Amino acid sequence: MAYCTYCSAEKLHSEKELPAIDLYKSKRISDVYNSAKRDGQQFLILSGKYGIVDANQPIAYYDHLLTAEEVEEHTELVAEQLSAIRISEVVFFMSSLKHDALVKPYLDSISRACEKLEVSLVCKEGDYQD
């Protein structure tokens, strides 16, 4: 099982690659990361650019919001990545679509990738401010 949440627009501007957990400036990401550590679960971030990213994976700064038009291609990338790490269940932490409609492409991508791989997906909505 892995806890997963989507990336954030707020990032630390850096010329060098940083571990994903340090790049994203998001209370939601930090909270889910800490919950995963507390519960002994793997933690993943769903990036609009990189797909599935481990918390400690170094990535470069980017500014990209996943769009509906990109979901099909993004889904293929995410499915390949999930398959490679052999995840059987994903718990996806997200804001409600009513609160943040920009989450929908991320939800669509992770949902389709999990469906393709027959991986269980549990979505947990929270009152996140980012």
Model-derived segments and spans:
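Peripheral peptide segments
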Residues: M1-D130
